[in-house]
Regions:
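Hydrophobic/aromatic beta-strand patches that form the interior of the parallel beta-sheet core
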Residues: 1-3, 29-31, 95, 171
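Short beta-strand segments
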Residues: 3-4, 58-60, 172-174
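Solvent-exposed loop/turn segments at secondary-structure junctions
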Residues: 6-9, 35-38, 63-66, 99-104, ...
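Functional beta-strand-loop-alpha-helix junction segments that form "active/interaction loops"
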Residues: 7, 23-47
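C-terminal and late-domain segments of enzyme folds
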Residues: 8-15, 19-23, 110, 115-302
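A short, aliphatic-rich alpha-helical micro-motif
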Residues: 51-52
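Catalytic nucleophile loop
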Residues: 58-61, 83-108
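Glycine/threonine-rich flexible loop motifs
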Residues: 64-77
Length: 302
């Protein structure tokens, strides 16, 4: 079943998915649930039972807020979301694509850049600068999920989200990549072309008092294609070479630091502005893991 509620063009998106699946010999149906019709569709008992009996449910990409507001209609759990939960309990696979992957978490990142998250913290509303966090669908409570980690420099906002919500782990998915979780989300196998990053916050060292945000020894662990993440231990069993993972992680962190702090170095050169409110220091272990020290002085009026 294809649920394209996250898409701005749900009918067209669902058709594209169904066409692609049929090209692989897989039959699929458009569940035809959108934010515009969910108040009516969630009352259709036949649809609810149809969803509960599905073996695979694909939540297409798009705006994750639109998806969540369709299944948690006006803040309430809909019969449609309960039907998806029933299907999952019976062994169905739930596939979250792009933004829909973020919606699978208990806490969902809905907006904001890494710089805004570090500089302003959690936004009080969508109209302000900062990190937007909303309730997610809760199918993947093990970690907060974020995606497009490289192109959008989202590693920083993922770390801030975990620290702010007291969630130990964050899972960042790189472009054209994902993870396959086992039945209880305790083991994740990285798939695709690039991989994923496991972010681990140390709650005993994290400080959120006043305008200061301090998260030292934030552990980063890169999982390349085929690597298996153990969510209980926070470790990775590697199939891909550690040297490749180390290079990929070091590049991600370097891009984040350049994006949020700049490249002026310890001394500000003439005509170059260095961010005075954010400090990021990274210690690479050379094996696809490392530690990121995060400090920022926040402006609460963003």
């Amino acid at each position: 079943g294809v649920l394209a509620a996250a898409s701005a063009e749900p009918r067209a998106t669902a058709r594209n998915y169904i066409r692609a699946l049929r090209g692989k010999g897989v039959e699929a149906i458009d569940l035809r649930v959108t934010i515009g019709n969910v108040d009516r569709r969630m009352r259709e008992e036949a649809l609810v039972e149809q969803i509960a009996a599905l073996r695979t449910i694909i939540l297409t990409g798009g705006n994750q807020i639109r998806l969540v507001e369709s299944l948690l209609y006006r803040g309430d759990v809909t019969p449609l979301l309960m039907a998806i939960a029933r299907a999952r309990s019976a062994g169905a696979m739930i596939v979250g694509v792009s933004g829909a992957a973020s919606a699978l978490s208990g806490f969902m990142i809905g907006g904001g850049t890494s710089y805004e998250a570090l500089r302003f913290g959690i936004a009080s509303d969508m109209g302000r600068h900062g990190l937007v966090i909303q309730e997610g669908l809760g199918f993947f409570g093990t970690a907060i999920i974020d995606q497009k980690l490289s192109s959008s420099r989202r590693l920083g906002r993922l770390a801030v989200a975990c620290a702010e919500e007291g969630v130990r782990y964050g899972l960042g998915l790189l472009e054209d990549s994902g993870v396959i979780a086992n039945h209880d989300n305790s083991q994740l196998t990285a798939i695709g072309t690039r991989g994923a990053v496991l972010v681990e916050i140390d709650p005993l060292k994290t400080e959120l008092a006043g305008d200061d945000f301090i998260a030292p020894d934030t552990r980063l662990c890169f999982a390349g294609p085929g690597d298996v993440i153990d969510m209980a231990a926070g470790t990775v069993t590697r199939l891909a070479p550690a040297t490749d993972s180390a290079a990929a992680l070091d590049t991600l962190v370097a891009e984040l630091i350049k994006d949020c702090v700049g490249s002026a170095g310890p001394v500000t050169a003439p005509g170059v502005t260095q961010e005075a409110h954010i400090a990021l220091r990274y210690r690479s272990n050379g094996d696809g893991t490392g530690y990121l020290d995060i400090e920022s002085i926040r402006d609460r009026h963003g």
